[in-house]
A protein has these predicted regions:
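Acidic-basic catalytic patches of nuclease active cores, encompassing PD-(D/E)XK
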Residues: 1-30
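Anionic group-transfer/hydrolysis microenvironments
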Residues: 31, 40-42, 61-63, 106-109, ...
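Short acidic/glycine-enriched loop/turn segments that link adjacent beta-strands
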Residues: 34-38, 113
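Structural motif
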Residues: 36, 55-57, 100, 117
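Mid-chain, well-packed structural core segment of small domains
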Residues: 68-101
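Domain-level recognition of nuclease-like catalytic cores that cleave nucleotide substrates
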Residues: 93-130
Length: 130
């Protein structure tokens, strides 16, 4: 049985996935598990005329409002470190020559019968990424 918070998170991930697909992203992985950590979405995009992939590790934050800050502001340094560890694990199994990587945050705000998306590409950088 899922809690209300878990159901909200799953709904937000579904909304974020659809939003990304409509903007030309392909989803490579959903809820990639690395022990107790996970990556919500792993998405890729290939720009016209190029063969290299841009791979984004997407953290989805779903909220009812921004009263306590934007969704991106809720991804603190501890969460960033966890995401980096999971990303390294994903890369070790899925690396392709020419891939570039980044961390994005998709904020999904649901409330009042509407949905608002806040997309933050390159939301944060990590020095020792590979």
């Amino acid at each position: 049985v899922l809690t209300d918070r878990q159901e909200l998170g799953i709904k937000g991930e579904w909304i974020a996935e659809r939003w990304l697909k409509l903007r030309g992203w392909a989803i490579l992985d959903r809820r990639f598990r690395d022990g107790h950590r996970d990556l919500d979405l792993v998405a890729c995009k290939i720009e016209a005329g190029k063969s290299d992939r841009l791979v984004a590790f997407v953290e989805v934050r779903t909220r009812f409002s921004t009263d306590f800050g934007t969704p991106a502001e809720t991804v603190g340094w501890k969460k960033q470190r966890e995401l980096a560890r999971s990303a390294r694990k994903w890369i070790s199994s899925n690396r392709r020559s020419g891939d570039t990587y980044r961390f994005d945050v998709v904020g999904v705000i649901v409330g009042g019968g509407s949905v608002q998306i806040q997309y933050v590409p390159d939301a944060f950088w990590l020095r020792q990424f590979g």
